[in-house]
Amino acid sequence: MISLQETKIAVQNLNFYYEDFHALKNINLRIAKNKVTAFIGPSGCGKSTLLRSFNRMFELYPNQKATGEINLDGENLLTTKMDISLIRAKVGMVFQKPTPFPMSIYDNIAFGVRLFEKLSKEKMNERVEWALTKAALWNEVKDKLHKSGDSLSGGQQQRLCIARGIAIKPSVLLLDEPCSALDPISTMKIEELITELKQDYTVVIVTHNMQQATRCSDYTAFMYLGELVEFGQTQQIFDRPKIQRTEDYIRGKMG
């Protein structure tokens, strides 16, 4: 369905283990460039495990292992000699709960940039404004950049985390249930932002909210018990699923 030319991430025969527990089983999947792909499925199905394998977050924890291939622009991230910090710069991540750093709004954005680039003060100011503008936050914080990131509302904090992620100019942005802790208005702003971000980034989102998947995503992957059950364009998955288990899940017949 997605050609090689359209592919940003190609997953081949991916298996993942938590010690002896086989959490992901022979996953094969292509993630399209400059599109939003949603992972859906019941709790414990493996969708967050799959998402976090894309930038090797699992290496922060003991006794976790991935085998197979996760090719980003043709390079296998599981075997590459690329520095792990560079991988996580290329494949940025925003977590379920907003996690601003204990520093100013300005430094929340500038911190990661300083790790990879030496910018003049003027250029750094431009980058901070650019990232906050991209995250639809600049107009709300431009007069209080010196204030702590913790001083913002939950929805603003999550947009700050998105701005922090895109400030280092990744090619992929991973969002792990980014709206689950937010109120409906903040959720709407994040969803609008996700739709806009695909102009510049490949976006992958894990969500329990199937309505959110239909609103935000171009492609949807349904997972169950560590297996990829069905993958396709979002409208097709929700309107005309080909697999009975997919239909049962989206119609609420299974948890």
Swiss-Prot record:
Membrane topology type: Peripheral membrane protein
Keywords for this protein: ATP-binding, Cell inner membrane, Cell membrane, Membrane, Nucleotide-binding, Phosphate transport, Translocase, Transport
Catalytic activities: phosphate(out) + ATP + H2O = ADP + 2 phosphate(in) + H(+)
Domain of life: Bacteria
SMART domains recorded: AAA
CDD domains cross-referenced by the UniProt entry: ABC_PstB_phosphate_transporter
UniProt domain ABC transporter: residue ranges: 9-250
MF (Gene Ontology): ATP binding; ATP hydrolysis activity; ATPase-coupled phosphate ion transmembrane transporter activity
Record Pfam families: ABC_tran (PF00005)
InterPro entries: AAA+_ATPase, ABC_transporter-like_ATP-bd, ABC_transporter-like_CS, P-loop_NTPase, PstB-like
Gene Ontology BP terms: phosphate ion transmembrane transport
Residues binding ATP, per UniProt: 41-48
Entry EC number(s): 7.3.2.1
A GO CC term assigned to this protein in UniProt: plasma membrane
Compartments where located: Cell inner membrane
Family: Belongs to the ABC transporter superfamily. Phosphate importer (TC 3.A.1.7) family.
NCBIfam families: 3a0107s01c2
Assembly mode: The complex is composed of two ATP-binding proteins (PstB), two transmembrane proteins (PstC and PstA) and a solute-binding protein (PstS).
Purpose of the protein: Part of the ABC transporter complex PstSACB involved in phosphate import. Responsible for energy coupling to the transport system.
Protein name: Phosphate import ATP-binding protein PstB
Species of origin: Haemophilus influenzae (strain 86-028NP)
